[in-house]
Amino acid sequence: MANTKSALKRIRQTATRTARNRAVTSKLKTLRKKVAAAVETSDKEAAAAAYNTFSSAVDKAAKVGTIPANRAANYKSKAAKAIAKIA
């Protein structure tokens, strides 16, 4: 167990950040699945709407540092390619 005040504070900070990062990561997974489901049904309008929500969430997560910027770009690129394939 931590012996100093600063170590106790670091434990609290880590717990808070871990909880926040888990929530954001979980939300991104859910939104990514919604985009995939919309692409699966070949509904371009629903896919575009889901992509806009997903893209915004990914950008926010990257800005805060929850995910790296390159990973955010990869997520958005893959989703955009999948939507573009819908005829």
Swiss-Prot record:
Classification via InterPro entries: Ribosomal_bS20 (IPR002583), Ribosomal_bS20_sf (IPR036510)
GO biological process: translation
Coiled coil: none
Record's keyword terms, sorted: Ribonucleoprotein, Ribosomal protein, RNA-binding, rRNA-binding
Keyword Ribonucleoprotein: yes
Region (Disordered) location: 1-26
Family statement: Belongs to the bacterial ribosomal protein bS20 family.
Protein's name in the database: Small ribosomal subunit protein bS20
Organism: Akkermansia muciniphila (strain ATCC BAA-835 / DSM 22959 / JCM 33894 / BCRC 81048 / CCUG 64013 / CIP 107961 / Muc)
Lineage: Bacteria, Pseudomonadati, Verrucomicrobiota, Verrucomicrobiia, Verrucomicrobiales
Gene name per UniProt: rpsT
